Regions:
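Sec/Tat signal peptide C-region and signal peptidase I cleavage site
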Residues: 20-26
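HEAT/armadillo-like alpha-solenoid scaffolds in large eukaryotic assembly and transport factors
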Residues: 81-93, 154-165, 272-280, 337
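Bacterial N-terminal signal peptides
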Residues: 8-19
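Low-complexity, Ser/Thr/Pro/Gly-enriched N-terminal "stalk/linker" regions
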Residues: 26-124, 168-172
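N-terminal secretory signal peptides that target proteins for export/translocation
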Residues: 1-5
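Beta-strand-rich recognition/accessory modules
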Residues: 595-672
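Extracellular polysaccharide-recognition and catalytic grooves
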Residues: 51-67, 107-119, 128-136, 144-149, ...
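Extended polysaccharide-engagement surfaces of secreted carbohydrate-active enzymes
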Residues: 275-279, 292-575, 580-611, 618
């Protein structure tokens, strides 16, 4: 019996495992940032067309942004006097002229042939050749960001006077248009406006928009905190919709995209903008506390849940946008709870660059457009992967320009963040990272009172990326006909699944983040099924996770089977080893059954990581077996699952089970 898993998923895991220890180090200086940018540039170089004078990224709306992002890299390289592949003044001159001379820059409104297009003029379209291509805020903003850097580097690049004048005109005319001027706003995405106002000030020397319009945007944003944030400061993508809208469950990517306005805050203050003060300043510090603790993991990857589901989840190009919040926070400690948070932000950025660098090294090219083999809607092609690489390369250049190569860096301690209204707990430590999402509001398949995913300290999948049923952690109770009466890992029904924070103890207060460093975090939840209920408790420490389940009949009759599941990742490459109390080891076969009595521990060996299950407690007669879960969209690389049968038959009324999980323990890795 074999478990099939997409080859790409296994290769991705092996690539990360082999490359990460050397690549994902923190504390980058300018030399490290340039080394990364040079390597990314070499991978993107084949896209350059000498005839056309542009990078051909593959169409689909990404070409103007990709070209502007690489213009940004070339411009910072010139500004800093860098010598290496990232420096190419001739290409920069050609790109700067091309981006303001005809498509993508337009001065007449494109024909409204695309229903979702944000039509306006002047502005930029999403094609280097079609003046009627779709428009969106991000197309303007990313192109303008690159042009602003080129303008700053105009002397080092020896830009022709005509190109400089056209950059100044295009940026200024666009920023002054109704599409961008106050009170214009797209949802609550103030970051794009901050970028445009800052670019206008850069190319014109006139900071009116930066002083006035950005100040008004920030005031409106923080005055609308009830619409922009849920309890615990989780982000709401649709501020004018119900908090229970599926897209408002949270959005790690958009929260950080909006938070990237911090890149321009210091420039605005120097230009005379009034500082955030009073309630807005307090909210800002709570938001950054929640964002760093709740949206990022120690390897520098997102602790990712998204109300937009497969439209955004694990998309590489969104990582490149989200990282800009880390650049801004690392460079603007005055907006954070304290200076150490800025040092942590830099560490997360640096490790994230290292993580991506390792993927690129092992793949021998540009990493995939979507990580961990999950599906995407719409399907993300190679052009999306190239845009992601350009964005992440540009972040290294932005970090250099922001002075992060000389800024302090520190590894964060174990961090947690809790959102009371949806029962989301995010946990990240140097050893592992995970999350519990009690209520998913229908945004994605996974969720419930259990670990929604489990990664090790290198962002290797240890157990799951978002499984359900037997591919998830948690308890399941079925009747004699196989009908499911209860599953603790089911996030669809908020009324029957509640999660509360036991330690540390907080009162639920709007405008406050329940987040920060920890040594001991505990949550408890209760799930009601059909005639059965469950009480679940989890304790998180920097090194381990301790879980307890108490299952009770509440009216269900006849024979019932209760199990607790521990999943793996990697298809047939994953395995499970049982160790008895005498130290004898046995690799379990699919379908085999084993008494739990006499076992000391289980080692769940996923493709690139591992975890140990020990301190097992279960009713007498409990058994375990290895089963093959079905393939799932949110967990495509599922390996075999350890299923512990803790109660069966018609006579049991309650069953109590406990276990400890230690991720990536040294003895496991020594044996692999």
């Amino acid at each position: 019996m074999t478990i099939r898993v997409p080859v790409a998923v296994v290769l991705l895991a092996v690539a990360i495992a082999a490359a990460l220890p050397a690549a994902a180090r923190a504390g980058y200086d300018d030399g490290d940032y340039w080394a990364f940018a040079d390597r990314m540039q070499e991978r993107l170089d084949p896209l350059w067309s000498e005839t056309a004078g542009v990078y051909r990224a593959g169409g689909g709306g990404v070409d103007p942004m990709t070209n502007s992002l690489l213009l940004l890299v070339h411009s910072v390289a010139a500004l800093e006097g860098h010598v290496g592949p990232a420096r190419n003044d001739e290409r920069a001159r050609r790109l700067a002229a091309r981006l303001v001379d005809g498509p993508p820059y337009v001065t007449r409104r494109p024909a409204a042939t695309h229903p979702d297009s944000q039509v306006h003029a002047p502005g930029w379209v999403s094609s280097m050749v079609d003046p009627n291509a779709p428009q969106h805020l991000v197309f303007d903003a990313e192109v303008v960001d690159g042009l602003a850097y080129a303008y700053r580097a105009r002397h080092a690049l020896r830009l022709p006077a005509g190109t400089v004048a056209r950059i100044r005109s295009a940026v200024h005319r666009t920023a002054m248009g109704r599409f961008w001027r106050w009170p214009a706003i797209r949802l609550n995405q103030i970051n794009w406006y901050a970028l445009m106002y800052a670019a206008d000030a850069t190319v014109t020397g006139d900071a009116r928009l930066l002083r006035r319009d950005l100040s008004l945007q920030l005031r409106r944003f923080f005055r609308g905190a009830r619409r922009n944030f849920g309890e615990g400061m989780r982000f709401q993508y649709l501020p004018d919709s119900s908090p229970r809208d599926s897209r408002n469950v949270d959005s790690a990517e958009y929260a950080n995209i909006v938070l990237s306005f911090t890149r321009f805050y210091a420039q605005a203050r120097r230009a005379g903008m009034a500082p955030l003060a009073g309630a807005a300043r307090r909210l800002m510090r709570e938001w950054t506390r929640r964002a760093l603790a709740g949206y990022w993991t120690h390897p520098g990857y997102l602790n990712w849940d998204s109300g937009l589901g497969f439209e955004r989840w694990h998309h590489a190009k969104k990582v490149g946008l989200a990282q800009q919040a880390l650049v801004g926070m690392a460079a603007t400690p005055s907006l954070l709870p304290g200076p150490r948070w800025a040092a942590w932000a830099k560490d997360l950025l640096d490790r994230g660059l290292g993580w991506y660098d390792a993927l690129a090294t092992r793949s021998g090219g540009i990493p995939e457009a979507v990580f961990f083999g999950v599906p995407s809607v719409p399907h993300q092609r190679a052009n999306s992967a190239r845009l992601a690489a350009a964005r992440i390369a540009a972040n290294a250049a932005r970090a250099i320009d922001a002075g992060l190569g000389r800024a302090p860096s520190a590894r964060p301690p174990a961090l947690y963040a809790f959102d009371p209204d949806i029962g989301r707990l995010a946990v990240t430590t140097p050893s592992y990272n995970t999350a519990v999402v009690a209520t998913n509001q229908g945004a994605f398949p996974y969720g419930g009172l259990e670990l929604a995913r489990l990664f090790d300290g290198r962002q290797e999948v240890a157990g799951s990326v978002g499984g359900t049923g037997h591919a998830a952690f948690g308890a399941i109770v079925r009747d004699a006909a196989g009908r499911r009466l209860l599953a603790t890992q089911d996030g669809r029904d908020s009324a029957s699944r509640r999660l509360r924070l036991i330690r540390p103890r907080w009162g639920v207060t709007r405008g406050r983040a329940f987040a920060g460093p920890f040594t001991d975090v505990r949550v408890a939840g209760h799930a009601r099924g059909r005639g059965v209920d469950a009480a679940v408790r989890h304790r998180f420490t920097p090194r381990a996770i301790e879980s307890r389940w108490l299952l009770r009949r509440r009216g269900a009759r006849g024979p019932l089977v209760a199990v607790v599941c521990f999943p793996s990742w990697g298809g047939s490459s994953a395995s499970v080893v049982a160790t008895d109390r005498e130290g004898r080891r046995r690799t379990l076969a699919l379908g085999s059954s084993l008494p739990l009595a006499g076992l000391r521990s289980l080692e769940v060996r996923s493709t690139g990581a591992a975890y140990r299950i020990d301190r097992l407690r279960a009713p007498a007669g409990a058994t375990l077996r290895l089963v093959r879960p079905p393939r799932q969209s949110s967990n495509p690389g599922a390996g075999p699952t350890v299923v512990m049968r803790v109660a069966s038959g018609a006579g049991w009324t309650r069953a109590s089970t406990a276990a400890r999980i230690v991720v990536g323990s040294s003895d496991i890795h020594e044996r692999r």
